[in-house]
Amino acid sequence: MFGFISDLLTAAVSSLDELLQDTPAHQIILGTAALYFLYNQYHNPSISRWYLSRNNASMKQRIIDSAYALAKNLPGVNQIIEKELNKELSSTREKLRIQRSGMTLREEIPEEGLSPQDILSAFDVDVEKCHFDFLSVNNDSPEREFLVGGGDGKDSGALYAIHPKELTELLKEVYGATALTNPLHDKWPRINAMQAEVIRWCQNLFHGSKEGYGLLTHGGTTSIIEAMAAYVIRARAKGIDYPEIVVPETAHAAFKKAAELTGAILITVPVDKKTGAVNPRVMSSYITRNTAVIVGSAPSFMNGIHDPVSELGQLAKKKNVPFHVDACLGGFLTAFLDTSSEPMDFRVPGVTSISADLHKYGCCPKGTSVCLFSEDSPALSVYAALNWSGGLYATPGILDGSTSGARVAEVYATLSYYGKNKYQEIAKSIIKLRNAIQKELTALVEEGNGLTSEDIYVYGNPQWSILGFRSNTCNAHFIADELEKRGWKLNLLQNPDGFHLCLTHVHTLVRGFETQFIKDLREAVIDVKNYPPGKKASGNVKVYGAVGMMPIELQKEICKQYQKARLDFTAASHGSLGIFTTSPTEEDDGLRNRKVGEQKVQTSL
């Protein structure tokens, strides 16, 4: 990844040569052979499990981590890492500085309350990015055109809906009326009833039974954690010391988070390299007596490809294990399309739970998702502490205690406002746009405009809202970088390299969206093909190019410092990352203690 790799290797090799100079050759050879054997066996289920029971990292990652643990203690290596990471991450600090240019950031809560007008002024920038003025308001018009205050519809999966003004005003009123309510208490029976209604609506959408159970959560990650925690707790109750969560390698990273939080072992199953979906026969070989749950995506975040849910359901029934379908991304899209020929919900025998995000294609406010359990689910996500000295304590769900009833009310209001017919209309328009993009891409490579299907192609056979792009002749990340120069904000993928475009209702309202995207894509690929040999990566391309060979400790440290920069307005522009230090510098102390005017800081961020 970084320019310091060669310096790091030089320092490490020099120290290693000195360390091993008196070691017999046969010991070095045998040690190297052992490492090689272990590295090549990391995909073997039986060997992998022995290591994964002690660490969720793959064998490859464990070798990298071990090498890093040794290397960072060698003379000079720490200084190289510290110096180069500060240099490489300076671009992050610079981006934050530019993003926050002109903002007034306060270090403390104001002594006296501010007026509503002053408070609202702090939101002006982000509100503008969600503001849309439509030129064509006739829903029957074939034309798609709008003016955007904060962009031109070139963001992938960032904004899923544009609420009509009357819905926006309704949500304001609903929030104001319910913000202080709490579904955990029976003081607000209507809020509790609304929550029950929302769960029933969602159960019906996914063809669940009246006896099904469900939770309204804060997002897809929370829904996944709730489901996985329920299954892990059940497994431990059955006497399984090392519960295993078996997922396709394309499953969302939230499953890894769930495994780490619950102390479970995450078992990743390779997917078919041609289709991008997991093969049930292959997954079967990874199921053991320790399996707490198996998982399938409908579809996956990476390439929009859904796993064979029906076949996985049969496998789950045969092996007598729970089966979770992750429909966080596309659940409220596919629920309004005809999937009777290939169901991906509770119609499939063996499916015991589903996660689906309301805040994506359900068009609900951000921070809303559902975790649904079938009538036959062997585990439910509930928590109870009945012998607590503070009284009886029980919550629907393992994570949440008190929550705002406004979340329930706003979901209720949004679903009620749109209605099934509107959701179906939105879903069909997204599929229509995806087909149009694929059609134009096919025409592009068939017309011989200097490009072939080897230069750029859609991976697998995505059927929903995501198109994953790859190239056999170019670095796909370079292509995405060129598209970014043309205003596109796409999601980079890795292992293997690629990028995806996640289509939303917003994109369907842009006249000529597919033509503009294909035009820019063609230009981007041609530009990359004309790159001089040996062109060096930069920015996100450089980061993605190295993360696969980066120790987990270093990955987490970089992420920690990045999040620290985002949440601390002094950390984004001052001082070093402090990766190998534990206390702030005098300069940092001075910045933190400094106050300007009435506790306001006109920062350059």
UniProtKB/Swiss-Prot annotation:
InterPro entries: GrpII_AminoAcid_Decarb, PyrdxlP-dep_de-COase, PyrdxlP-dep_Trfase, PyrdxlP-dep_Trfase_major, PyrdxlP-dep_Trfase_small. Keywords: Lyase, Pyridoxal phosphate. Its EC number is 4.1.2.27. The modification N6-(pyridoxal phosphate)lysine is found at K360. Its cofactor is pyridoxal 5'-phosphate. One of its GO terms (molecular function) is pyridoxal phosphate binding. The keyword Plastid does not apply. Cleaves phosphorylated sphingoid bases (PSBs), such as sphingosine-1-phosphate, into fatty aldehydes and phosphoethanolamine. Possibly implicated in influencing the macrophage autophagy pathway. PANTHER family: PTHR42735, SPHINGOSINE-1-PHOSPHATE LYASE 1 (PTHR42735:SF6). This is Probable sphingosine-1-phosphate lyase.
